[in-house]
């Protein structure tokens, strides 16, 4: 049917009726162009697979989330995408020879490598390259599990899940070093339900002062999550939360995750919900229409499980939105600044795979090099032999012993250093960096790399993935059948 429609459009036959299995070179060329045009139109998505910048189509690496300027898809696909986007169609690349990565690596007599996610691909390394994968203990485990370390591993439970930390043998109840808390995935039937739960998690932890890194699979998704953190979207979500909580309370029912026909109108996409309709729901339940009002604020805090001390941050978030940074291929030139702030108290960073590997997020925020240099000079002047070998905690302890009057021209830098260290302490008390994944990747190692941004070098930290049966990966592998069962 597709070829018949194409023949009608072009006014020429695409195959010889007597020998349909054979194609002329011209017919093969036209069918190839048509196939690439269909791929460009229906499979390759703007702000996911590529960006359009300065009149050019630039590929986005699906594994790293970074731009690949100068790279072009082959066989006319790049030209088809250029035609789709209305930019100048450039000459196609000519390929003289190709080789697979597997065969390329086999050209070497010696082959070795190192990565933090090799174990997930151990079978492939053995099968294709005859390479064994050896797991090297992390620095934390090496230090903690030595016989002379004075540390012991302790188990505890949180939300029904088992987690571990290292404590000194003389004080086993006080954690000295942490292992990351990987919470189980949460799966929702619709993307809308997932987005709401994701934003509620961000709002809750932001109000507690815990920094968050929200991982997304595309530029488009990162911008969609960013839109949900604006004040108007948060207020609308808060109204829905208030209505649901009040309805269940009024009808003496517990919220068990099952669909409630009476509340089904609230399941529509958030931007489609009428403010007037939400206001009517609230008034009928005897509530104020202002989600930031005193009574509503206290009710929202209970729904989110927040202490009274967090209500001020909750009110600020509802009134002004949640201040956050977005790191994607469009903002690659701001990467260092965004990453430097990602571990600050209450910071929220929404990022594509760019933040999933090779990124070290410091709790409390990154200390400027000039601040550390100034502190080291003060310590050296005070008689410390080599302050550059100290950890920041040790620098803090030493600096507190030096009066401000002896800090000379570096008083401001020393004060800033102590403030940053105090902020880092508060972040650790809040639970460290929490990583939230908005979708699973096709390659498990990319998910592991994202999780690995939290709880580095014994710092506290946690991770969790929020999924829906409408996610691309779920749709590809039978999510519709599970969705029908959930209904």
Predicted segments with their positions:
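Conserved P-loop NTPase motor core
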Residues: 1-487
